[in-house]
């Protein structure tokens, strides 16, 4: 399995088991993300802790996840970035657009805090 999906109560976590997320594998990730979205999943955490490299195709898949979540008023969080991957995210200024957390536990906390914030805004 290249991508492992774990459905939780409030979100789905997609873990990438690939060392490289490139043009060969990004379409499969995009397909999985679209499937989750069409299944009613609003909140997604992508865990890239095992991924050492990705290119523009990998970035595109990550942006698809962000767009799909936002399109249904959901939350997207990226976690487990290796230093080289984190550098690429910073260089491309995606760190200003995406919710990024260093660890899975922090990603879950961030997702829950964002959800509480949205719930409070909708009650106002």
Where do the PLM segments sit?
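Intrinsically disordered, low-complexity boundary segments flanking structured domains
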Residues: 1-2, 87
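STAS-typified acidic loop motif
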Residues: 2-34
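Residues that form or immediately flank small-molecule/cofactor binding pockets and catalytic motifs
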Residues: 10, 83, 105
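A charged, well-structured terminal subsegment
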Residues: 102-124
């Amino acid at each position: 399995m290249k991508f492992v999906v774990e459905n939780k109560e409030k979100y789905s976590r997609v873990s990438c088991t690939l060392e490289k997320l490139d043009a060969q594998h990004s379409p499969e990730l995009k397909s999985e993300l679209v499937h989750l979205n069409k299944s009613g999943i609003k909140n997604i955490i992508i865990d890239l802790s095992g991924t050492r490299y990705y290119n523009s195709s990998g970035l595109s898949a990550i942006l698809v996840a962000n767009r799909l979540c936002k399109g249904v008023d959901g939350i997207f969080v990226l976690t487990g970035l290796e230093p080289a991957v984190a550098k690429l995210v910073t260089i491309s200024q995606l760190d200003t657009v995406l919710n990024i957390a260093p660890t899975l536990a922090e990603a879950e906390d961030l997702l829950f805090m964002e959800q509480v914030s949205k719930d409070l805004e909708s009650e106002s």
